[in-house]
Structures are given as structure tokens and as C-alpha cells.
Amino acid sequence: IYANELVLDRRTKGLAPGTIAVLEDGERKPVGLVGVTPASKIAGRMLERDTEIEIGRDWLVAKLTRALELRERLFATPYYRLVHAEADGLPGVIIDRFGDTCVVQPNAAWAEALLPELTEALAEVTGVVNILKNAGSRGRQLEGLDDADAVLLGAAPEAPLPVEMNGATYMADLTGGQKTGLFYDQRPNHAFAARLAQGQRVLDVFSHVGGFALAALA
């Protein structure tokens, strides 16, 4: 919810980033619960329509459980984007899974404020033993958040991890690579490009881990 679509009084503007608040319409009727970042152009992120629900560990467990059930229907192995922000009911949050390791990008202030609860819920739902925080997103800067990466649970891998996608094996650098280490969101595009590339010569420019090139070769 953009700031120019809201009436923000002095008290609202003084809320700490990440505060959970009730959003009301022009008639002061509750619309839902939002994570507030008063100084950002995205001043509120809708979390829940039911204003009686507590946004905490149990709520996060429910959201993550639903996301996991969907991924397990779609993927045979635990290498995928587990949470894709608003699409999974967790606005501003990206979670990529690499076997027993997850990389979390809490790109919204509300998620940063609930990071301990999110870490516990993620470990409980998925059973992963390593959880890393990637704070390199530009979105965090817009939320007024720091850029400090961290190990939230377990340990960081000492070397890039092999990930099989579209018939090719990619090496995902979870601590030194771009974003979370691999562009899971490009998986369908890699597969589409591979079909177009059959029997052709392909140039993959600015390829990072070789997403399109390796898919074309496979």
C-alpha cells in the first residue's frame, strides 16, 4: 500500500518500522493487518484480512506449511523457491531452499522485526538445519534496513552447492553469489529457452551461473 494512498497522522508516522497495525478505510472500518514502514513509499504491506489474528510464530508456521505443500506437489527434490513474497502471503519475503539449507531475504521491515520467529518457523516446517540471511537486496535499503548478512541457524556451506535444474547441474554460491545464490524464479524461462535452442548456437551474455547456457546445452 503506497504512502500516497494513505492518511498518515503524526502518531502513525511515528510508528517504528515493522510495526503491525490495523488498516482502516475512509469510514474507519478495519480492512486488515499491515506491516508498517512509515518512511517508505510502500508504507504498508497487507499481511492478513482478519484483524483478530496474531501475527507471530504460529501464523508464520501456517503460511510456510501451505507454501511447502505447494512446492512438494511441483518439485521432486527440495531445491526451489519456497516463498515468493506476496504470492505466498509473506510480502517482502523471499526464501530459497537448497536441500537442508534455506536462504532468507527479509526485504520488508515487518519481516526483519519477526526474523527470530520466522527462523524458528522455517526450521520447524521444513526440517532444514541451516538458515542464512541475505541482506543484499536494494529493497532493504528502501525499507531503511541494514545490509548485514548473517547465519541464523546452523552454518554456511564452505563451497557452492550443486543444484540440478532442467537437466543441468548448477553451482549455487549461497554466500558470495548474487541474491540467494541461484535464480530459481528463472527456471521456467531456462526451460523455454532450451526448447528454442535445440540444434542452434547460443550466446548467453552476462550469464552469472550460466542459467540459460547450461539449460541449452542440457
Description of each model-found segment:
Residues 1-99:
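Non-catalytic accessory regions of SAM-dependent methyltransferases
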Residues 184-188:
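A glycine-rich, Thr/Ser-enriched phosphate-binding loop motif common to dinucleotide/cofactor-binding enzymes
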Residues 190-218:
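Conserved SAM/SAH cofactor-binding pocket of Class I
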